Design a protein with these regions (language model features):
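Phosphate-/nucleic-acid-contacting segments
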Residues: 146-189
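Short acidic-glycine-tyrosine-enriched beta hairpin
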Residues: 63-79
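A small-molecule sensor/coupling module
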Residues: 91, 110-147, 151
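Short phosphate-coordinating micro-motif centered on Lys-Gly-acidic
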Residues: 37-42
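Cyclic nucleotide-binding regulatory module and flanking cytosolic helices
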Residues: 1-28, 84
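Glycine- and acidic-residue-biased ligand/ion/polar-headgroup-sensing regions
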Residues: 46-57, 75-76
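Ligand-binding loop in jelly-roll beta-barrel domains
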Residues: 86-105
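A cytosolic small-molecule/anion-sensing beta-strand core signal
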Residues: 32, 52-53, 74, 99
């Protein structure tokens, strides 16, 4: 939990009262490679995960049974199915550990309690959501505007260690290309 407080302290002051309260309502969890944290179609309350170590991805399985990677998450990133987390509906995405992971797990009710008691943490969280929103929009624009090779090099720049962890079809689906196209791009490096 100390790593999380150090992460917060980079941007805001966290006193001992805030640390104690956060520690009482948010859980540190360890998961193994291959563990599924959220399952597409899941209807119970969903959690949000802050990554301390490891690599995760969110993905959707389409009507033909094909997986499409939506997001990768690395150290100091958050991951969830935000449509369900904020909208209270069924999960549209699954979240999978691509390696052994240590995460901070928070449900919506607990995090709202933190925000009520410590408004400066809510401001910090909103700023992080804004960064995530920008990152998501950049990904959409790049997907529409860039060719596959440029999208691949952006991916390598954004996630330098992900290729050693993610399977080829994870990376290819994230880029919106086939595994064969990914192999061709890599061979041209």
């Amino acid at each position: 939990m100390q790593d999380f407080f150090e992460y917060l302290n980079k941007s805001i002051d966290i006193n001992d009262e805030a640390k104690a309260f956060i520690s009482s309502v948010i859980k540190m969890r360890e998961f193994k490679k291959g563990d599924i944290l959220i399952t597409q179609g899941q209807s119970k309350a969903l959690d949000n995960y802050f990554v301390f170590s490891g690599f995760l991805r969110s993905y959707i399985i389409d009507n033909d049974g094909k997986e499409h990677t939506v997001q990768f998450a690395i150290k100091d990133w958050w991951i969830s199915d935000y449509i369900a987390y904020y909208g209270k509906g069924e999960a549209m995405l699954s979240v999978e550990c691509l390696s052994d992971c240590i995460v901070l797990q928070s449900d919506k009710i607990s995090i709202e309690k933190v925000f009520e008691k410590f408004p400066h943490i809510e401001t910090f969280h909103r700023k992080n959501l804004e960064k995530s929103f920008v990152r998501l929009n950049k990904r959409i624009v790049n997907q529409l505007q860039l060719n596959a090779r440029d999208r691949y090099f952006n991916f390598i720049n954004d996630f330098p260690k992900m290729e050693s962890v993610a399977k080829n079809y994870h990376v290819a689906s994230y880029l919106g290309i086939t595994e064969q196209s990914l192999s061709r791009i890599r061979s041209q490096e």
